[in-house]
Amino acid sequence: HQFSDYKTTWTFKCRNEYVYFTEEMVEEIREQIKNFCKLRFTEEELEYLDNIKWIKGSYVDFLRLWQPRYEDFSITTDGDRGLSIETAGTWLNTSMYEIPTLAIVNEVYFRMAYDYESLLKSFKERLLEKKWMIESGGYKLGNYSEFGLRRRLSAEAQEYAIEELNSAKTKESVFVGTSNVYLAKKHKLTPVG
C-alpha cells in the first residue's frame, strides 16, 4: 500500500543464547509458513476491518487482493542456533510477514522443545495468579491491553489469556483490547496497536 515499490529484506534473529532449533523444528516452521501463505481474508473479516476507524478503506481494499508469498521466504538450518529466516521483496510484503513469522517460530519451538502441556498448565496457573492480583486490587492497571502475539506460547495460550483478562472486572483495572485483531473480533474487544 504505502512504499509499494520499495525493496527490502527482513531477517529473523534469535537473541536467546539457550535456544536451538532442530531440523525437525525448521521443517515444521516451513510447513506452518506455507500454511500462512494459503490464508486469505474473508469478506466478513474485511468488513470488520473496514469498520475500524483507524484503518483506511484503501488499505482494506488492498487486503482484499493481498496474499503472502512463500517464494519471498528463505528458511534454512544455516543460521545461528539452527534457524535462518529471511524474507525479501517489497517493503509492504516483508513488513507483513514479521509478526506471523515470530508467532509461528515461538509456537513451533515451545511445542517441540518442551512438554507443551506442562508449559500450558504453568502458563495458565501464572495467569490466574495475575488475574487474582487484578481482581483483589493488588494490581491497579487502569485501562490496559494485551500485546502477546509476537512472543506468545501458542494461539491457544493467547486466547486463554484474553478470555481470562476480559473476565477480570474491576474499577481500577479495565481490560480494553488486544493487538490480535482476529481475537479482538472474536471476543468483541477493541483492536489496539
Language model segments and positions:
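Ordered alpha/beta subdomains of enzyme catalytic regions
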Residues: 1-193
